[in-house]
Amino acid sequence: MSMFADIPVGVGEVYSGERIRWQDTYVEFGGLRVQYKFELVKVRKMDEVVDGKITIIGPDIKDLEPQKSYSLGIFIEVAGSQVEEELEGVIERRIHEYTNYIEGMMHLNQRYDIWIRLSKKSFEKGLNSFHIIGKIYQRLFKSELPIIEKIQITFITDPEKVKEMYDYALKEYEKRDARARGLKDEEVDAFYGCTLCQSFAPTHVCVITPQRYSNCGAISWFDARASARIDPKGPVFRIEKGECIDPVKGEYTGVNDVVKMKSGGEIQRVWLYTAFGYPHTSCGCFEGIAFYIPEVDGFGIVHRGFAELTPIGVPFSKLADSTAGGRQVDGFHGISIEYMRSPKFLQADGGWERVVWVPSAVLERVKDFIPKHLVDKIATEKDAKTVEELKNFLVAKGHPIVKRWEEKAKAEAAAKPVEEKALPAVAAPEAAAEMAVPVSVGVVGGFRIILKNAKIRAERVKIVREKGK
């Protein structure tokens, strides 16, 4: 008999990756429409946990008005003789996996940024109470992580209680992150990988190092090491570093080998500390995005909770579409907030000296880790809402990026006379170098123009297709 025989909907890995659109949603918890939401796991002593207890503080699912968004706190307390405090982040991240095992439920993100949807179909089938979801969690946790001997779960929907616990949760996350700081990538012989999000991004492999947290911000190197130890066949695994090919970009032979295998050959190389070339892939649960702004040759950072437009006129959701899915896209880099505190943060791209715009809420959280001479030179949404305003701010504040513009302009000016030097009128052989220029015509098709030993100056070029060709 299945351990989910009494559950009104299906439960299993087959439902992972299910996307629930708003029109098919019965209720939504968290997400952009709600300010306060969280999921938190705490390790307790054996006598502090009542095994199997499920508590709901506030209205249950069946008592909520449909087609609305609500605050939600998921607070799980676990105990066991082998359960250690360093496992909290690992257990917590499994909430994402187990929620997606439930037919008609979609879970994205983590920690203080959760986004959950319940479909109309599953509600109609009888999935109308957190008691049911709690039972599923408890059975999955105990089945897949048998070191958990006792587990009690509290669901909070009362907005005031969620807000109260939200502040407590933030302090717990910070304490957990602080424990992981200090260790350097060069000091360990192995990194860790995570494929927990492959149900949404099949080619994504998260590489977790001491100085590069998981994109979701929920798993440190210590968390990953503990997870791989207690669940060696689980989604978190050890990666032998191998040879360091490039210490600045962060390329390792061992990482390349594992990522190639785990991505089914789609991703061949990874540079851990840059947003260009072969950047680390992104799933969909990243806390923030580093995005390149070509007009200023610098990076903007935007987090999931930012509801306004970025200076390039695009919101987080649109940038996320360009970043997620397990792809390597130059200039779009999914990151965690904790990675922004790392000395390896965009190391190959110039680090914080290349960052020009960050939402004030995030800047406040990481300002103690930004070089002091840069803190007031980085614009926020209060300083610049357009690229032009951003340029003016950077010049007025003397951001280092301005010097970069000046040096680039000087280099271009120095190269210009050489480029414009007239060529002697000497006949060139047919074997001389040639340049091919693809020219698009309409939606599909095109011509290929080959220029041989030619220097062309034109204010305007017009190409017209001849009739019948």
Language-model segments: residues:
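Glycine- and charge-rich intrinsically disordered segments
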Residues: 132, 136, 411-432
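Compositionally biased, non-globular sequence tracts
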Residues: 423-469
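N-terminal charge/polar-biased segments
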Residues: 407, 411, 415-419, 444, ...
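Cysteine-centered metal-binding/redox modules
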Residues: 1-413
